[in-house]
Structures are given as structure tokens and as C-alpha cells.
Amino acid sequence: MRNYPLKAVCAVLMLGLSACSSLPTSGPTDSAVLEINQGADASELAAKVNVIELNESLVQQIYAAQQSQRFSGFADVRGNGGYAGAVNVGDVLEISIWEAPPAVLFGTTFSSEGQGSGHVTQLPSQIVNKNGTVTVPFVGNISVAGKTPEAIQAQIVASLSRKANQPQAVVKIANNNSSDVTVIRQGSAVRMPLTANDERVLDAVAAIGGSTGNIEDVTVQLTRGNQVKTLAFETLIADPKQNIVLRAGDVVSLLNTPYKFTGLGAVGNNQQLRFSSSGITLAEAIGKMGGLIDTRSDPRGVFVFRYMPFAQLDSKAQQEWAAKGYGNGMEVPTVYHANLLQPETMFLLQRFPIQDKDIVYVSNAPLSEFQKFLRIIFSITSPVTSTTNTIRSY
């Protein structure tokens, strides 16, 4: 009879041990994450997770890719300077021709106004056609595409010199339709003609009336040919080198996209947190989450979960993941691992950038899980021990 309570305690302990796997926890352990794509029982998604250790080479590579988004890195295939003042297809030209008296060609043919001792004739406005030409009376079609107004003036005078009396010409671009920039903002879009003033990115932002959103949430996207770069509005304002001269055909877009990441695990705050479009580092993200909880966290198990666009992988990685069924337009599930027990990792945290929709997870320490188990065991065995003592007292 006296062994019965002891057997009951042992039975409760065995029951507690069998329930170890059911202990409440905030997420997987560090070993579970690191071995996610290993083992025969790995799910189809888990088998395709890319687990990457944080190291100096990787951080430098990611940092360089982030710097490549700066507008100052645009390749300028047109040489220095912006708008060159050249006429092109679609432009509207106004041509005025002077002829000294006595006027030979332009005396009565067109409506004109006297001006001093000369005679000026204003030709009807003309749109440069697809062939790049306009028509001038007594000259015919002349090629103007790619030429400046001054060059066209000289061309007209040379063509009329043997027909008119001391001709002079003035060519003006009335509407610059071929050299403009498209500026887009939510609910609004404008076309900004380029001039010899060399308009820059911030001029385009001003042309559309600036941003309507919080400056911390706004990014500026510049599309030039096949290149697309996105930069935080704050960075564009703070760094004059990014306020580059615009080119004909550029598209400037103001995007109001609040950036967020989610903090989970053994950290001070398990929640979704916003950050500026200028970005934050992993070190700053951990600080925003309230840091690691001393009594729970495993500093060896700091992870960043992210979907990485296939196109952003290097050529070697693309070949590896293409063999697993990935291709352009797809995203590779990626986990970055940092071990904070290694002092050099602290420097890497200050360069590793957090991206929109990232999950930053800190695993629980093994000792923390064991302490949970002990609390459960003691909460179960205490009433049994009390009962045993009561029975023995009889």
C-alpha cells in the first residue's frame, strides 16, 4: 500500500515526459529551422527552402545590390547633359521668315506683318511627321529630325538664299512632344516637357505637385529604357547625387507603400512593425522588437524569413533553383541565419537590410523549454505529493 503513491507519482512523470512535445512554444527551435529542408519527412515546400548562413561576403553582396538601386548608377548612353534641344518626330514647329525689301517671294503670298525695313512671314504651325520632315514654301520638304532649331534656321536660309532677297529665318519649338518625361502619382499623371534647363528628378516631383503621403512611406521609381530603380524619397532629398538629370522617355513614379516586417519568437514584442522606406538593418529591427528576452531567447537562433525573387539570385543560384522547378517570376523561400554568440555577427547585423514583409524570428533556448517542462511536472506532482504525505500521516 505504501508503494502505491510512489507509483502514481512515477506514472504522472511518465505522462509528463510523453507530453514534452506538446509544451507550449512561440515557434520552432533553431535546429528545426536549420534542418528544415533535410530528412525524408520534409514537406514539398520545406524541401525547397534555401537556408543561408549570415557571413561577411553575403552581407556585402546584399548591401551592394541595395546600393545598385541608387539613381546615380544609371548608365548614361547619351553622354553628359540632358535635353539637347533637338527637334524630333511629333514636335510642333513655328517658322518665321524675313525677307529684305523689295520682297521677292514672301511679299504677298502669306499673311504677314511689316517690321522695320524688312518683311516677316509667319508660317502655319507644323507637326514633324513620321519621316522627320516639315514643309517650307519654295523649298519643299526638309529633314529636321535630330537637328537643333539653329541648324534648321541655317538650312532654310541656305535653301532660300538664291530665291529670296536676303532671307532670314527663326525656328521655334512650340510644343516639345518628343522630349518629355511622364510623372505618375496615385490618382494623377502629367507629361513634363524637357528644356535646356536640364530638369532633374525633383523637378518632376514638383511638376506633379509633390507627394500626398507621409514622406517616410514614399519611394520614387525611375524607369529608363529597360532599367527600373527604386529609391526612398528621403534618400533622394538628402543625397544630391541621386537627383540626376532626366532623359526623354523617362518615367518617374511616386509610390506610397508603407514598409512592414513581423517580429516573432523570444523577443520583447511579437507584432507587425512599420519602418521607413529608407530601410532599416537587422540590428535596428531587433531593437524595434524590444530586443531578445534574456530568460527565453536562444542567441544562436536569429532568423530572417523572406521570399527572394528568382531574378535577384546570382547566376549560379539560379541554375541550382531552376533544377528544382523555379524560374523567372517566381520567388524562392529563403531563411537567413545569424548566431549572436559570435561577436563578429554584431557587425553583420548593422549592414544586413530588412525588406518589406520579412519575418524576424528568434527561437527559444533549450533551457527555456526544459524549465517549462519542470513547471508542468511540478504543477502535476505537487498535488500527488501532498496526497502521499496525507496517506502516510494515517
From Swiss-Prot:
It is a multi-pass membrane protein. InterPro entries: Poly_export, Poly_export_N, SLBB_dom. One of its GO terms (molecular function) is porin activity. Residues 1-19 form the signal peptide. GO terms for cellular component: cell outer membrane; pore complex. It is found in: Cell outer membrane. It comes from the Bacteria. This is Capsule polysaccharide export protein BexD. It comes from Haemophilus influenzae. A lipid is attached at residue 20 (N-palmitoyl cysteine). Its main location: membrane. Keywords: Capsule biogenesis/degradation, Cell outer membrane, Ion transport, Lipoprotein, Membrane, Palmitate, Polysaccharide transport, Porin, Signal, Sugar transport, Transmembrane, Transmembrane beta strand, Transport. Belongs to the BexD/CtrA/VexA family. One of its GO terms (biological process) is monoatomic ion transport. Gene3D superfamilies: Outer membrane lipoprotein wza domain like (3.10.560.10), wza like domain (3.30.1950.10). May form an ATP-driven capsule polysaccharide export apparatus, in association with the BexA, BexB and BexC proteins. May function as a membrane anchor for capsular polysaccharides. Possible porin properties. A lipid is attached at residue 20 (S-diacylglycerol cysteine).
